[in-house]
Amino acid sequence: DYAGGANPSPAYYQDLPSYFLADTDGPDYEGAYIAQENFINNGQINWNRIYDANLTNNQANLNAAYVLYEDRVDDTQLTINSAYNREINENIKVTASANYRNLVSDNFAEISDMLGGYSYSNIDSFDYLDYNLLSPNSIVSEGDKFKYHYKMNAEEMSLFSMINFSFNKLEFYVAGDITNTTYQRDGIFENEANAGNSAGKGDEISFDGYGVKAGITYKFSGKHILDFNSAYLQKAPSIRNTFTNSRVNHNVVGSDINGLINDSPITEEKIMSFDANYIFRTPIFTGRLTGFYSEVKDANEISFYYAD
């Protein structure tokens, strides 16, 4: 992090040739050439400059300009599975299972090295907003959490069953499952830019889904086999694709602090698929011809961008 210094990355966009070539007043070829040479000859982070900046700030009783930190995700998970299998007769087999999973995910940034500095400010240097109003204007150092801190609680319960039928030339199966998934964000920091929507527990987000699968295989002979499968599934979106910016607020996709946006709440993903296979065997080789169709609805993906 570089709250008190310039971006130390040699690949910072304002130091690359493309930045000068995209100048609104026309391409700056001289600047682009100089940037290219600097990148070729000095393409590594200048650690000496970073340490010098922090040591200079120490002498002036200022906070460090640079620190090294890591984004941490510490998960604690409990999983319970139960399975049941029974052979009704030589032609019919039944499988069933029940599953429970509980996840507590602790997410935070932690300073791992002060890079010669003594202290660091837990303030966003871009807009001068506090990262944690619960401890305003705090000073942090190595081993301290800063920038963001929240926990994500997730719980999933599911039931699954499948029945298989097997005869001389014909095999087929039918399977189904139901699943309930819940997410809840618990903010440890109160981000000033999201005050009132950052600390504490947010709303519990719940998803109910089900799935149905079926398939049939017909063996004309040991050399020629036809196989068909179909499925319709509903599944909860991932945690990442449910919350728009979980590091700093409780907002979920399709809503903000004021409620729903365009009356479009986030919902389960719907997946429909079919496939058909023809398998043939000869003494020389084995081949397979496959055709398939898949359709996904109500899926979403969170992306981020930087605006200068």
What are the language-model segments listed below?
Residues D1-V104, A109, T286-R288:
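Outer-membrane beta-barrel domain signature, strongest for Gram-negative TonB-dependent receptors
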Residues E87, L226-F228:
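N-terminal presequences and immediately downstream first alpha-helices
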